Amino acid sequence: MFRSYILTFFLAIGLLSCETLSKLPTYAGSAIPTDAEAATGLRQALEQGVGKGIGVLNVQDGFFGNQAYKLFLPADAQLIENTMRQLGMGGMVDRAILQINRSAEDAVGYARPIFLDAIRDMTITDAINIVRGPRDAATQYFRQKTTERLTAAFSPVIRASLDKFSATKYYNDVISTYNNFPTTINKLNPDLPSYVVGKAVDALFDQIAREEANIRENPVARTTDILRKVFGWAGAR
């Protein structure tokens, strides 16, 4: 369903590239949408599609159960993980990893209003540039418009989620245990919140990019009157 919602977005953009939709002839009896109607259809399709995409991640196992997005310990902590598993302390590591993923799953839901603001701010020029651009043009648009806000908004949310799911505690237990080993020379303390923020933002954009790369040949989902009008006309062309 998510792919079909996003497909409607690209079809709408195709309509927007016409100089004046209202001056074109009628095709196969389908009413010709105005520029305003086409823009409305585009925004509706985007809102539905982004909502579905966020929904893929904002559920239990959205990160933990998906190998494409599953979070492990930060790169700087890989030595810690390997050492503790060799010493029979893998359970402590696994518990920390699980709760880190639960925190990310909880936090990504807060991305929705940020994406919706970017959609509402999209101009006709933005839409034309997207359709004329590369296959990931929409993802690039969202990266440009939302990355800074997503990172800023996610930072306190991720910290709260890490505490809510005790991920901070379990992670600190792992780090403290490793740092207290007599053989540990270089004590480590990687920044967990910044790591999770970066991974969560990357996962959101990756979800959009994956769909964008495959949507052009998927069936159309027309879920409102305006979408049926806009995309019924597009199909008749």
Predicted regions and their residues:
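Bacterial N-terminal signal peptides that target proteins for export
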Residues: 1-6
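C-terminal motif of bacterial Sec signal peptides marking the signal peptidase cleavage site
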Residues: 14-17
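Bacterial signal peptide processing site
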Residues: 19-22
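Mid-length scaffold segments of soluble, non-membrane domains
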Residues: 90-164
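An amphipathic alpha-helical core segment
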Residues: 157-204
